[in-house]
Amino acid sequence: MPKVPVYNVKGEQVGEIELKDSVFGVPVNVAVMHQAVVNYLANQRQGTHSTKTRGEVRGGGRKPWRQKGTGRARQGSIRAPQWIKGGVVFGPKPRDYSYKLPKKVKRLALKSALSSKVRDNEIIVLDEFKLEQPKTKKVAELLKNFNAKSALIVVPQGEKNVELSARNMPNAKALYANLLNTYDVLKYEKFIITKDAVAIVEEVFA
């Protein structure tokens, strides 16, 4: 079982915690993590892009000039693809990019991501992190105390003020422990998690 220090919000060590091998000590599988990240990003895509074909562009019903005798190339419509303001050939149409990844693959990817954070000493366990009201300054101070350029902050469900405090920071994100995903774990430099959230992660994803 990997042992990691426990800190307070000021960055001072106040103890140690043992993390479960089944969640934080598995072999790091890069290929599976890649699959999970690609799946996550694909599922986020709106897919509302659209272009018009020659049949959908307004106008172009009349033949621009007669077929023969002008010396110019024959044309059937001013909305054909080769014309300016013509339709698009094989352009994008609205589609759903989402697809399902097996639960076991998703879970293995998340465990690999968490284990990589432990291996690279990029995990920071806090004794607690609670805010009485949303304060972005408090989250900024937390990152500064741990020299973190960016961080994912994982808290138990219900810590709404922490989530709101990190919302308008480009280099930080707060996430409930039960909503943890591979993409967010890997995206940020530091993985900051409270002791209570560790227990939830170990229970949900073990």
UniProtKB/Swiss-Prot annotation:
Keywords, ordered alphabetically: Ribonucleoprotein, Ribosomal protein, RNA-binding, rRNA-binding
- What GO cellular component entries does it have? ribonucleoprotein complex; ribosome
An annotated Gene Ontology molecular function: structural constituent of ribosome
Span list, region Disordered: 45-76
Key word Cytoplasm present in the record? no
Superkingdom, natural source: Bacteria
Q: Could you tell me which SUPFAM superfamilies the record lists for this protein?
A: Ribosomal protein L4 (SSF52166)
List, alphabetically, the InterPro entries matched: Ribosomal_uL4, Ribosomal_uL4-like, Ribosomal_uL4_dom_sf
Please name the GO terms of the biological process aspect recorded for this protein, alphabetically. translation
- Which residue windows does the record flag with biased composition (Basic residues)? 60-71
Give the protein's recorded name: Large ribosomal subunit protein uL4
Q: What organism does the UniProt record list as the source?
A: Caldanaerobacter subterraneus subsp. tengcongensis (strain DSM 15242 / JCM 11007 / NBRC 100824 / MB4) (Thermoanaerobacter tengcongensis)
* Gene that produces this protein: rplD
